[in-house]
């Protein structure tokens, strides 16, 4: 096992990941519209972390949620005249297809909010009983934010924190986040404190708080930088309070780290549904297919930016990635030709088969939030070991490219420098098959499958 370093957005410092269970919770989608580049940049970034952590020999508990109980989903379903459950299933399938396009590995657990409703109710009941949450006459339940210092976790002053609050409904205090929408809520579920449905922060708090039997746990909260406050702060506060002893003392052995990806702009503004300046992954895939490019070029275009960087998408981003991909592929073909090898193409479907396998069970399978969960990885990760798949039965040159990629990724996922390292080897004339497999395992670019 080897150590690596990441940047903690809360402490604004580098954290070294030692020997521990790595629990990675990345906020998933609200399944009502397709995946755009802003989403993709986040998921590719944390997929790279997932790959590196597995390669290092760690146990990794990677969880993503699906917000199938969420106001934007209900509103959009009503607007287009479709049942929200049908919309959630259809859009989740499309999201999985987009994740395959991006060559992302499926997390160990992809869990809809609807599967942990009982846990959410129990969590809210506990907060109410400890006078940490309160119910209004209209049925809404809010968390009492006076128990914390909103914005402090990420060094926002009160004025800035207030400007970032997304709550359209307020309780006794403008910083109090909604936990349970009681008034006029349809659909709704019964609870001891009144019928309604859960809100965003408490849902993620419960999902990120699923029990494990490990003692030494480092918990990474992942998402876009715009989630830091209020979402990640309140998710973390609620999570700690839910798992704290009933005497209200927050005795906790879990170390929390926050990693946030940069924001992607297009046409001068941050990509957002409200502004309509979105570039969808499905559109880029069609664009690649029309000109004979493999879809992994989209992932390569995203890896050209450091995960913490704010940047703007332009057509040149894809062109540059395509040139890079051709350079790498040509260098591999040079090696294949020199060795007289007929084909290196793997006969598997890569990440596609893995995403297809989990799709059917996401909404239909039973999930007991009370039972401890354990690390589990997709089938294509079976050959991960401390040395990865690169360098095994290869030459010193094979191993040194693997080491070069790993060196840069261990430095806070420095993908731009990792790509430069592959460029350097490709320009020397050849990329060997073991080197190409190192590129796939660590960077997710499948040179041997295209």
Swiss-Prot record:
Assigned protein family: Belongs to the class-I aminoacyl-tRNA synthetase family.
An example Gene Ontology molecular-function term: cysteine-tRNA ligase activity
Principal location class: cytoplasm
Protein name from the UniProt record: Putative cysteine--tRNA ligase 2
Catalysed conversion reaction: tRNA(Cys) + L-cysteine + ATP = L-cysteinyl-tRNA(Cys) + AMP + diphosphate
Location(s) in or outside the cell: Cytoplasm
GO terms for biological process, alphabetical: cysteinyl-tRNA aminoacylation
Example of a GO cellular component annotation carried by this entry: cytosol
EC number of the protein: 6.1.1.16
Motif ('HIGH' region): 29-39
InterPro entries for the chain: Cys-tRNA/MSH_ligase, Rossmann-like_a/b/a_fold, tRNA-synt_1_cat_dom
UniProt-annotated binding residues for ATP: 273
Organism classification: Bacteria, Bacillati, Actinomycetota, Actinomycetes, Micrococcales
Motif 'KMSKS' region: where in chain: 270-274
Region spans: Disordered: 372-392
A family per Pfam: tRNA-synt_1e
């Amino acid at each position: 096992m080897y150590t690596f370093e990441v940047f903690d957005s809360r402490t604004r410092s580098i954290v070294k990941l030692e020997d521990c269970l790595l629990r990675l919770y990345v906020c998933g989608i609200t399944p009502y519209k397709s995946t755009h580049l802003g989403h993709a940049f986040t998921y590719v970034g944390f997929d790279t972390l997932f790959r590196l952590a597995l390669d290092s020999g760690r146990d990794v508990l990677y969880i993503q949620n699906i917000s199938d109980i969420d106001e934007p989903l209900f509103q959009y379903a009503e607007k287009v005249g479709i049942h929200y459950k049908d919309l959630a299933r259809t859009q989740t399938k499309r999201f999985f297809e987009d994740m395959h396009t991006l060559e992302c590995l499926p997390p160990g657990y992809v869990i809809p909010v609807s599967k942990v409703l009982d846990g959410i109710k129990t969590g809210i009941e506990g907060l109410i009983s400890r006078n940490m949450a309160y119910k209004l006459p209209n049925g809404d339940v809010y968390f009492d934010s006076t128990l914390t210092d909103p914005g402090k976790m990420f060094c926002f002053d009160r004025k800035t924190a207030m400007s970032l609050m997304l709550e359209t409904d307020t309780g006794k205090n403008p910083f109090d986040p909604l936990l349970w929408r009681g008034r006029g809520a349809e659909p709704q579920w019964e609870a001891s404190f009144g019928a309604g449905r859960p809100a965003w922060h408490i849902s993620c708090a419960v999902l990120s708080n699923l029990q494990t039997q490990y003692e030494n746990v480092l918990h990474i909260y992942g998402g876009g930088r715009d989630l830091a406050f209020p979402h990640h702060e309140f998710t973390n506060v609620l999570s700690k309070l839910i798992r704290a002893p009933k005497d209200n003392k927050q005795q906790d052995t879990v170390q929390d780290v926050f990693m946030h990806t940069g924001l992607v702009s297009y046409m001068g503004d941050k990509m957002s549904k409200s502004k309509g300046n979105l570039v969808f992954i499905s559109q880029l895939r069609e664009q690649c297919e029309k000109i004979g490019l493999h879809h992994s070029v989209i992932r390569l275009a995203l890896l050209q930016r450091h995960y913490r960087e704010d940047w703007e998408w332009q057509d040149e981003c894809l062109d540059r990635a395509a040139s890079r991909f051709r350079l790498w592929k040509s260098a591999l073909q040079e090696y294949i030709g020199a060795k007289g090898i007929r084909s290196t193409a793997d006969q598997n479907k890569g990440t596609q088969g893995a995403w297809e396998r989990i799709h059917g069970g996401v909404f239909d399978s039973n999930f007991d939030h009370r039972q401890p969960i354990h690390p589990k990885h997709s089938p294509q990760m079976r050959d991960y070991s401390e040395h990865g798949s690169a360098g095994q039965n290869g030459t010193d040159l094979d191993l040194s490219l693997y080491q070069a990629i790993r060196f840069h990724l261990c430095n806070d996922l420095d993908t731009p420098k990792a790509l430069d390292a592959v460029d350097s080897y490709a320009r020397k004339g050849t990329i060997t098959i073991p080197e190409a497999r190192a590129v796939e395992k660590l960077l997710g670019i499948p040179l041997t499958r295209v």
